Amino acid sequence: MSRIGKRPIPIPDKVAVTIDGSTVKVKGPKGELSQVLPPEVVVVQENSSLLVNRRDDSRPARQRHGLSRTLVANMVKGVTEGFRKNMQIVGVGYRLQVTGNKLAITAGYSHPVEIDLPKGISVEVDQKAVPIANSKSQQGFNFGVIGIDKQAVGDVAALIRAVRPLEPYKGKGIRYATETLRLKAGKTGKK
């Protein structure tokens, strides 16, 4: 049995869970999420917790057991606390600006790159420059991608990072806050 799949999911008081066949809907103070689970698993609500069980011990059921439990647990956490992906933008003149549901990124191109933010996702930008780890002279800006759907938050963060990935010589670009970069040595020149 899956070690992750057999753990019960606690349901906080503010959260309402509706199970309709293979569809699980979770409603909480931050919003509402729904997920269609694979037919190999079944979700059962007992008192103030959810249990994800397999229908049988077939290989597909074993493979999807832990995944299904994690998806439901992330939905419960998302509607109560939400998810945040912390990021940094480093480089001279590199900026972020949020207007409505559009994010304009100025990252060394001749034009700002605009990204449409999906519904339920927001970007919070800290306008104060902070020193960057592993660098003596560089400063950057911290920002965070916030939402209730963990997958959507990760997708938008990856989309933003892809605008200007880190370059290994000066360390400029957009990075996750937890990402580390080993700078490469540049050319040594003629002697």
UniProtKB/Swiss-Prot annotation:
Question: Which keywords annotate this record?
Answer: Ribonucleoprotein, Ribosomal protein, RNA-binding, rRNA-binding
> What GO biological process term is on the record, naming one?
cytoplasmic translation
User: Is Ribonucleoprotein one of the keywords?
Assistant: yes
Keyword Ribonucleoprotein present in the record's keywords: the answer is: yes
Q: Which GO terms describe its molecular function?
A: rRNA binding; structural constituent of ribosome
Q: Which GO terms describe its cellular component?
A: cytosolic large ribosomal subunit
- Superkingdom, according to UniProt? Bacteria
| PANTHER family (UniProt xref) | 60S/50S RIBOSOMAL PROTEIN L6/L9, LARGE RIBOSOMAL SUBUNIT PROTEIN UL6M
Instruction: State the function annotated in the UniProt record.
Output: This protein binds to the 23S rRNA, and is important in its secondary structure. It is located near the subunit interface in the base of the L7/L12 stalk, and near the tRNA binding site of the peptidyltransferase center.
Record's subunit section: Part of the 50S ribosomal subunit.
| Similarity field | Belongs to the universal ribosomal protein uL6 family.
Please give the NCBIfam families that the UniProt record associates with this protein.
L6_bact
Q: What is the protein name given in its UniProt record?
A: Large ribosomal subunit protein uL6
> What's the source species for this entry?
Cyanothece sp. (strain PCC 7425 / ATCC 29141)
